[in-house]
Amino acid sequence: MSTSHESHHAPVDGAGGPSTTGHEWDGIQELNNPLPRWWLWTFYATIIWAFGYWVAYPAWPLVSNYTSGVLGWNSRSAVVEQISDLQKLRAASSAKLANVPLEDIEKNPELLSLARAEGKVAFADNCAPCHGAGGGGAKGFPNLNDDDWLWGGTLAQIQQTITHGIRSGDDEGHQGNMLAFGSILSKADISNVADYVRSLSGAAPGDTPAAKKGAEIFAANCATCHGENGKGNQELGSKNLTDGIWLYGGDKATIVQTITNGRGGVMPAWGPRLSPTTIKALTVYVHTLGGGQ
Amino acid sequence: MTSAALKPEKSPKAPAVPDEEPLYAARRAIYPQSVHGRLRTTKWVLLILTLGIYYLLPFVRWDRGPNAPDQAVLIDFPTRRFYFFFIEIWPQEFYYVAGLLILAALILFLMNAVAGRVWCGYLCPQTVWTDLFLTVERWIEGDRREHMKSDAGPWTLEKVTKKVLKHSVWLLIAWWTGGAWVLYFADAPTLVKELVTFQGSTVAYASIAVLTFTTYTLAGHMREQVCTYMCPWPRIQAALTDEYALNVTYRYDRGEPRGSVKKAALAREAGRKAGDCVDCNQCVNVCPTGVDIREGMQLACIQCGLCIDACNNIMDKINRPRGLIAYESEANLEARIAGKPPVRRIVRARTVLYAALIAFIGLGMLYTLVGRSDEGIAAIHDRNPVFVRLSDGSLRNAYTIRLINKKLEDRRFQLSVDGLPGAQLSVVGVESGTDGEVISIGPDQTREVRVLVTHQGKLASGASIPVTFRIRDMVTGATASTADHFIGP
């Protein structure tokens, strides 16, 4: 190539190299390396794809609605479909759980892990807000890991409690309240009973005059439900006062408050909300947290 | 162009006539000519070796005894196992795969430090399959000249027949490539039987379809464009190379000035310098990516060395020494031009470092692989609640413990806890017998159990006592242990 011929060509980078675009900044020239044409066509294809997408799927917001797309797809129906797929997938394992008696599930390692896995998820969804993520409980909400049960810790008792609840309005649910003694007993009497109750679990000395007075008041007013020796009664959901485990707190002020105003925590009935299989799984899960009897 | 020529000359400072060059360029058809030579033979050997391994490996059997697949290489997704001859990788041992990837990267770096992009030229799947597809193309449509002539000419029945035949063979190869891929994920003979009787899974058919399409497109149609536009390796390689790396290089000091054999002979007689390059363009014609190696190192060059073979053949014919194009380092080229002794430095900081790292990681992996046990235990302490006070005043901690049995037979393990004298251990769902808590696990399986540890005595406030969970095989006595803590209020 002669120089005169080259003069009306774009400048070239070195011998035989690609031409430059002619743009120059501080002596740096931009090479003109054309993109491959298929690249351009790929770009056009994505644009066409975008138009197709607008038509096929929900895409554009309108004043009070949105374009729904000719495919009729929406995320809500997609979720419904996925859940039904999941249920189909789980049908076999759910059937296994449903057909085996509650007492036999824990004897079978496969069923046990199945029930615990399902129970864990159901617990997190439904029970954790009150009982805590690991069933550790909170003030007024029993710790499900220990061996202290208000209404009983056998599989059947746990299943009954979950299904029908406590003071839930369900006819078969557990009833029974801790009465408010504020209008029945004097403040001094309540204080004495509180001292006695604390002595039952060894939290306070039992040989003080106050505790001795409290023992008499206890026998007259509290023993009906809590038993003469304060061991409680699971039929009534009355608490065992001799162990060191407290639902609302074991300090004197809290006990005085409990005696004065009474207690009556509510657990909802889960029978109407959860499937029998799920309740079964939940029962096994709670039972195997460690306190199961 | 003509109108531009009539305009007055522009100053060199503003030379812009950029619109003459297109922004987008259609692909320039490349018709690489066949070539014979040492490097071509090497490529043939590697092609047969690598493709042979790829296509046939799934059919190699490896007896692992009962309860285990007998396929030598198997990626078993349903049971989450990876089998490689005598090695069985569990999901939690995925670090071996990570290690292999790191090794692969380092080996690539080492290859690059020693001899440039040899990976690209000889072993890269894109190169190997493109080479195979080119061979089919040459076999059906003829070598460079014949093929070019046919493509430029009118559509005849013969041309159509050849094109149809070529694409059919390509699709067949592509289909078999996809087919071989899925065989790595299931028992190969069974899957083949299922596939031909249309009993195979949708995933298998879809995978084959996708891989057929990509193989056909990438090796048949995209070819060098994958290397030039899509592959990141040329860019990375450019950042990793140095002046001692061997690259396919045109020795311009020997080749220039170019000229015909006659002109060169005349020039030499007259005592003038004459290059060995006779401008025969053979190096360009044989190049599968269509570059001219005489322009120096460039991005599109995959360094397959076919131009070396082509040039050597010409040099032999014109009785000039071979190696006008050769694997040559920048440093050696410069040394030769400066009249200094040749430079060959394969042992240098980066190659030593790469080799040391490869050896270190490789030996480390080997060491852990050899020292692997057939049983394992892992524990997670309950976080919420961390501990529980029982009605009798004792303290209890709960753990989720997973036991691993890598042997291909049922095993029974005795579980015990050390570090907390007097503590009682119980496993949910397991009856306590005379041997204590004995947990059975099926072959090649894991089992998760909930373990409760109860302590009667008093603990210091805020106690966190180190404990060790231990399992012991009831038959062989093999043990495994894991450390955790017993926590008090």
Curated annotation (Swiss-Prot), chain A:
Subcellular location: Cell inner membrane
Residue intervals passing through the bilayer: 43-63
InterPro entries the record matches: CcoP_N, CcoP_N_sf, Cyt_c-like_dom, Cyt_c-like_dom_sf, Cyt_C_IC, Cyt_c_oxidase_cbb3_su3, Cytochrome_c_Oxidase_Subunit
Keywords carried by this UniProt record: Cell inner membrane, Cell membrane, Electron transport, Heme, Hydrogen ion transport, Ion transport, Iron, Membrane, Metal-binding, Oxidoreductase, Repeat, Respiratory chain, Transmembrane, Transmembrane helix, Transport
One Pfam family per UniProt: Cytochrome_CBB3
Positions annotated to bind heme c 1: C127, C130, H131, M267
Gene that encodes it: fixP
Organism: Azorhizobium caulinodans (strain ATCC 43989 / DSM 5975 / JCM 20966 / LMG 6465 / NBRC 14845 / NCIMB 13405 / ORS 571)
Topology relative to the membrane: Single-pass membrane protein
The record's free-text note on cofactor binding: Binds 2 heme C groups per subunit.
Region (Disordered): 1-25
Cofactor(s) required for function per UniProt: heme c
Binding site for heme c 2: M178, C222, C225, H226
One cellular-component annotation, GO: plasma membrane
Protein name as catalogued: Cbb3-type cytochrome c oxidase subunit FixP
